Amino acid sequence: MLSARFKPWHVPLFLAKYAYLTVRRRPVLVHFEVTMRCNARCSFCDYWKTSPSARAEELKSFADAARYFNPMVITFTGGEPTLRKDLEILVRGVADAVHLKYITLITHGGMLTPKRARSLWDAGINQFNISLDYLDERHDTARGIPGLGARVFGALDGIRAEGVDNIRFNTVIKSDNLDQLLPIVRRAQELGCGVNFSLYTDSKNGNRMHLIDGDRVPELEEVTAELLAFKRDNRGVITNSDHYLETIPKYARGELAEPCRSGIRTIHIDPTGHVKRCPDFPTDFHWTEFRKYEPVACNACFYACRGEAEAPMRLSRVRDVMASPRL
């Protein structure tokens, strides 16, 4: 699903840029981790333990890095990016530095008021990705923010009234929310939102509690089959590629042996301007000293950023991106 800001004639332009970046082995997607600070308390992530003093080291602009890489897709993430009061300035600087781009923001949504959403939209955000792993109180518990789910759903009408027309839920597939995946998709469809799935991994802090063990793989296969069937009948809601959804059970069964291409099509730039190939890897160099990455023999995760980078660019993938959910 795309914002109404984008028209069908943008497709060949984006495909041309995608081809150019791929041939040149330049990143198609750059994640700007604008802060490692976070006010959530997720059990599977330790970013919330980042000292408040880290704020002093955060870059005041990512525009030069954006101009250097000239990616097709840009994501502002963290930590919790909306903690930065100057986030609009950061977004506007990057938006002005790159031609032909698609800019997204990943947030837990707890501080995304309609007014703030409109301000970020005007600065250049094209899509808001709000984390949502459960439809009940488990979401509040998992994120450590009381009332978070109600706050997110309560703000959606106001955000849409501000003219923001592109909201997705980012849902992590975990052992204890397999029963929630299809209901989340249906709720998103009712709200005119999209859903993007990513498989849980313990590589952030070693928490294995949410890993899907081998005896749960048949259930995982059943759920992903249901998601694929829904996707075939309702284009524009689930925004993952068929390839990614089909490959998730294979990864869970330990059947994925291909090297990871993180760092080739996607990179992460931390709050100080240093580059890492993966969000769970240490940094390698400052962006001004960037060196091209090679595939790495790592099977620690099957995040969407890895799986989607391996998905073939077919016509069906273009339809996935262009289609919009029907209210």
Task: Describe these PLM feature segments.
Residues 254-261, 268, 272-327:
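Flexible mid-to-C-terminal extensions adjoining Fe-S/redox cofactors in radical SAM and related proteins
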Residues 54, 118-262, 271:
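Radical SAM enzyme [4Fe-4S]-AdoMet core and its adjacent flexible, acidic
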Residues 84, 112-114, 178-181, 276:
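Short, well-ordered alpha-helical microsegments
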Residues 2-127, 327:
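Conserved alpha-helical substructure of the radical SAM core
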Residues 40, 137, 276:
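Glycine-centered loop/turn positions within well-structured domains
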Residues 23, 28-33, 243-249, 267, ...:
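Short, intrinsically disordered, charge-biased short linear motifs at domain edges
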Residues 33, 131-133, 200, 278-281:
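Generic beta-structure capping elements
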